[in-house]
Amino acid sequence: MIVIVALYQFTDLPDVTEVHAKLKNLCTDLKMKGVLLLAAEGINGTVAGTREAIDTFLATLKSDQRFAGIAHKESYADEMPFYRLKVRLKKEIVPLRMPEANPSKMVGTYVEPKDWNALISDPDVILVDTRNDYEVKIGAFKNTINPEIDVFVDFPNYVRENLSEFKHKKIVTFCTGGIRCEKATAFMKLEGFEEVYHLKGGILKYIYSIL
């Protein structure tokens, strides 16, 4: 059995070059495959390996206090789903082209899945989907605003052009796995939005927790 782990963590990594080298060597030694992205703002990726390899990888990662509380989700496969290992240095772990929007420094309020339905049932809430247009069309929560963006880097322009009048309203966002809406709320806080919330762990955690 192969264990697949999707993970991310926003945290300041001034030594990101050293962290990159350490994790690349670790994953190589453990014969893991998949993709890890590292930037000064944190880590994001999906990797796969044996149970022993994944346990060793996570234990080593969490031994660094900056990753002690890292969010990760496991799934399983009979065969290795990836062909190779890629551990890459990037400017951002989720591209927004807004490096000052750093969730480890300022971010919206996390909403647990169990509290989500009650929050979005408030008629005064402005519910915004931070996913790309094709994802939104697959399905979304009732009364969701679709920004109709093709890529996440277009989100800031959408907000500035369409949501500025709602800076004093309660803005609630969601995405697939939690990472984009964290970055989105960090940006919106910078823009002066007073009350910004996002679904912790995204739609995936909501489905596992509620349905």
Which role fits each region the language model picked out?
Residues 126-130:
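Short hydrophobic beta-strand that contains or immediately precedes a catalytic carboxylate
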Residues 1-109, 131-211:
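Rhodanese-like catalytic fold shared by cysteine-dependent sulfurtransferases
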Residues 106-125:
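Internal catalytic-core helix/loop-beta-alpha segment
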